Structure formats: structure tokens, C-alpha cells
């Protein structure tokens, strides 16, 4: 089991989290319980949970969130997650998240092909890896600062920022800060 803070935010007890971890370790990735936890975690931006389950299963996970906050979850072997057509989903997609379990967070050639193909329908993308979270924002959907690094200087990847990895420790600190602010407001 991987220790996850603030399980109550997910509506889970330690025992329930242990059971979900067992499902992931056993690669029971179509389990409604596991998928429900992933959807809840995704809706709360709890990428630590999504990454941990992916790491335990030894499989990559892809999360797609549409313009109406519908969430689609797909699983696959490293380097190959076949996305199921999310019926009834509305573009543009707010976010595409995928994992590199046990490896660094980087934009692989498969990832950059997906970003290039999705450059007119995906607003933001994250890759979750062992050191943390790597984010990219699509300039077609937001105003960026002047000196942002891009994934490429040419073609559709020129629309996508190439941002530094945010380490898990730093990410947890921002999660804790946001939780404190929510309690104040």
C-alpha cells in the first residue's frame, strides 16, 4: 500500500484505500471501485492517487476531462494506452493526464504525437512520473507569458508550453496550502 494523505477528502478510510491498492496491484483495472476512486481523485485534482494506483498496477493510466467535467479513464501497457472513444463528451477537453509509472515525467514521442493531434481540442496536459508532475498549457486556449519554453519551435507543438517538473513534495505542499485556504474561505 502507498500512504496517501487526506484520504477523507476522497471519502475513503485507510481500510478502503488498502482494498483499492490491492485491486491495482492485482491489475483489476476494470473494477468499478477502483475506477470510481480514480474518477473522484481526478475530479479533485488528486494526481497523487491516480499516479499511485498506476504505479501499483505497473500500467499507464490516461485521464481525459471534457468541457463539462466528465471524466474518462483508460489503462494500458507502458507506451501504449488505447483511448476508448468517450461517448457524449464535449470538446474542448479541459485536461489530458497520463502516467509514466516509475519513470520520469517527460513528453515522449507518443505523448508529443498526441499533443500535436489534440492541439485544437485539448487545453492542458499533465504527465505524472516518479519525480512529480510535468504540465503543458496550450496557447490556443489561454494567454501565456512572453518567455515560455515550448515543446517545439515549429508546428502544432509550438502551441504547447514545456514547463518544469513540480516535485511531489512541492505539489503536496501546494495541496496542503489550498486545503487550508478552502477552510478559511
Go through each PLM region and give its residues:
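Conserved beta-strand-loop surface patch within small alpha/beta domains used
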Residues: 1-95, 102-185
Amino acid at each position: 500500500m502507498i500512504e496517501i494523505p487526506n484520504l477523507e477528502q476522497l471519502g475513503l478510510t485507510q481500510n478502503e484505500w488498502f482494498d483499492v491498492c490491492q485491486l491495482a496491484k492485482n491489475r483489476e483495472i476494470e473494477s468499478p471501485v477502483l475506477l470510481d476512486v480514480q474518477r473522484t481523485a481526478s475530479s479533485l485534482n488528486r494526481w497523487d492517487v491516480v499516479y499511485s494506483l498506476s504505479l501499483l498496477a505497473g500500467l499507464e493510466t490516461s485521464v481525459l476531462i471534457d468541457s463539462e467535467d466528465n471524466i474518462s479513464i483508460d489503462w494500458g501497457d507502458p507506451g501504449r494506452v488505447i483511448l476508448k472513444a468517450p461517448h457524449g463528451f464535449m470538446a474542448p477537453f479541459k485536461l489530458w493526464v497520463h502516467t509514466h509509472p516509475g519513470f520520469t515525467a517527460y513528453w515522449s514521442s507518443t505523448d508529443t504525437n498526441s499533443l500535436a493531434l489534440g492541439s485544437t481540442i485539448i487545453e492542458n496536459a499533465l504527465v505524472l512520473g516518479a519525480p512529480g508532475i510535468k504540465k503543458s498549457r496550450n496557447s490556443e486556449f489561454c494567454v501565456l507569458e512572453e518567455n515560455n519554453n515550448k515543446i517545439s519551435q515549429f508546428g502544432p507543438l509550438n502551441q504547447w508550453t514545456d514547463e518544469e517538473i513540480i516535485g511531489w513534495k512541492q505539489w503536496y505542499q501546494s495541496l496542503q496550502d489550498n486545503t487550508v485556504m478552502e477552510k478559511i474561505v
